[in-house]
Structures are given as structure tokens and as C-alpha cells.
Amino acid sequence: MVRIGAVRVGIVDVGANTLRLLVAAREDGRLVALREQRVQLGLGEEIERSGALGEEKLAEAAAVARAHVRRARKLGCDRIDVLVTSPGRQARNGEELASILREATGVATKVLRPEEEGELAWYGAVATAEGPPESVAVCDVGGGSTQLVVGTVSGGPAWVRSVDLGSLRLTRRVLETAPPTQTDLDAARAQVEAAFVDLAPPLALAAIATGGTARALRRIVGARLEPETLASAARKLAKRSDRTIANDYGIDRSRARTLLAGTLILLEVQRRLGIALLVGRGGIREGAALLALDELAAATG
């Protein structure tokens, strides 16, 4: 339970696949989620198809963000932030998207730089982990991009990289057919390997995977993603249609469609880190909420 009068913050996360709301407060040093909502919108799919967001999709995003902010206000949030991830960076009219969201919601709206997105995901994942060791790597596979961050509990993020390839983007490029042909599967693996070829992350004692792909994989193979586990999951997914994946594992159809692509990305990340990935409980929204709570606390002395 969160005490009456506790400071509350609302984070609206505008991603390639979904628009999500987190309303949270801090209780006994822990971040407590008071409300979470998710609306599938597919901004990244339209960006991949045409390079920009059309008027209809912009209007949909504005309406969903407005509803999320209205809900956050009803729940008594002291601060609400709208954060735009890859759609704001990858769409030709990303600035227009941010402007429309700002006008629709009346709250601060920011297009995150890749490094900012990665750092927030790192803070959110580490803060919600059970007794993390000193050095931790965090991988956040989004729809349009992937962030990989290594840092220390005492010092924060120290090594931050972003790859312009995510689960939705890879699906649109080479994995539209489900189940895929062997040619498509080979092409997907080649694209992933090429995207990560220059990444050599420092050693970490633990690694956390955040994002929708990791959460969905937990339903299939559990919370510990070893190389054999990820490879097995990829083989299973490559033999199924998205409808079958959704039915077999109780996963949303839209997530099932991009799950193989996300798994291939995580498999490459795990290979480069050299240690198992643990599915995290927090990510970018939790990191942003913690930052907002810290800033509010500092402002009030």
C-alpha cells in the first residue's frame, strides 16, 4: 500500500509498438506501480512502411496520449511526462509527432536520444532487480531500436550503445511471413549480426533484459535466458504462425508477430555479453518515474 499523500508521477511512453502509461510512487524506498495501461498503436510499422506518420496515425497517438494523461491526472499525479522513443527519432516528421502530443496533452513532451533511453532503461531495470551485483548490463529491445547499457550500482551507466534495429523493424524487413522461410530466417540473422558487429560491451556480473520481447519469452522459457534457452525458443517460434504463438503461449497477437525477431536480437546480445540474461521487472518507464520522483524531491528540499 502507498501512503495517502505520497508523491505520484505519471510516465507516458510512446514507443514503436505501443503507447503505455505508468503511474507510480515511492514507498519504503521502492517504486510501486499504481496503474499501468497499454494501447497497441503500431507507429513503428507505419514509419517502416512510408518513412513518416500520416495524419490518421498522428491523431490516434494524440488521442491515446491525451487519455493516458487524463487518467494520470485523475490518479493525482504531481508530475506527468510524455517520452517518445524511436518513433520520434526515426520518422521524418518526428518533431511534428512531439508537437502534436505536447498540444494534445498539455504536458512536457520529449523525444529521447538513444543514450537517454538506454540510461533510463538501465536505472529502471537495476532499481527493480532483487539484490543486483555491482556491475550490471541491461538490454532493452524495443520495436524500432535496441539499447545496451553496462554500468555499476554505485556509479550508474558507464557504457551506453544504441542499435537502430528492433523487433518490429526486423520483422517488417525480413520476417513478414510466419512461419518464415529458411531464406528469411538466414537474412534476419545476418541483419542482426551486421547491426551488432561493432559492439564489444565490457564484462558485467549480471545482465537484465527488459521490454516486451523479454516479458513474452518469460512465458515460454522462464525468466533466465541462457544461450541454449534462447536458441530453443527461436527454433520453436520459427515453426509457428503468429496466431499459433499467441494461442500456445497466451501472448498478445501483435507481440507474437514480432517475437521471433526480438528473440534473435536477444540471442546476439547474450552472445556478446557472454552471460545469461535475466528478464527484468522494470525498464524505461520505471527509470523515468524514479528520475521524476528524485527531481520532485530535490525541488521541495
Give residue ranges: language-model regions.
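Early-domain small/polar-rich strand-loop-helix modules and first-structured segments
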Residues: M1-R38
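Helical "lid/coupling" subdomains associated with nucleotide-phosphate turnover
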Residues: A6-V9, V23-R26, L41, E46-L75, ...
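A short acidic Gly-Thr/Ser loop motif
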Residues: D13-T18, C139-S145, T210-T213, G283-I284
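Extracellular/periplasmic ligand-binding regions of membrane signal-transduction receptors
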Residues: I80
